Amino acid sequence: MNVGIVARKGNDEAVATALDVYEAARDHGETVWVDEETASSLASEAGSPTVPGRPVAALAACDLAVAIGGDGTFLFVARNAGDTPVLGINLGEVGFLNAVPPASATAAVRSALDGLADGDLSVREAPRLVARTDEWESVPAANEIVVHGDRRGPGSGIEYELAVDDSQYSTGRADGVLVATPTGSTAYNLSERGPLVAPDVDGLVVNEMAARTGM
């Protein structure tokens, strides 16, 4: 199997954990690589083995992606991984998405590889959002899509109309409108006083940002 590892930039603990995970997956018999910046960091350390580095875009062709850092690192990996399952090693303060502590990283990777080999890997599928117009389309977003005006505050904002399945649901004026996945309910949505939603809920959050009128 092909395993790609991405570590948080500029973090010595992330680089060290990446090396541990690399060696665990390699000893498991897999083809393993790390992101180019982590490979460069390892190459500069005396006594470190030569570890192959690849662009993060190569994650989409992997059987397993490993994100080492905080939620930002996890989301960065998810944007590049396509349908590849992502295992998160948490080095951040919160870690809503990265569930595995560094001390359990190698054991978690070996368990995931065993699950993939046996065809019984337990995964949680997370929805992603795409914004689309006649002229462009966004990359898939794991957290949220936000529509807003040029600036926020008094005298600014947008008039909006919200439709669901081509039927008008609401109109109003606000600084903007945010649509979040359950995963994203813990991010920007929460700072805009939106609700927390359990990851397994089949739905989306629609949140007015500093609304002038209620939905």
Regions found by a protein language model. Give the residues of each.
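ATP/NTP phosphate-donor binding region
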Residues: 1-64, 104-121, 133-138
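N-terminal glycine-rich "phosphate-gripper" loop used for MgATP/nucleotide binding
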Residues: 63-71, 78-80
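Short hydrophobic core segments
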Residues: 65, 145-146, 176-181
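Gly/Ser-rich helix-loop-strand patches that form or flank binding pockets
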Residues: 81-89
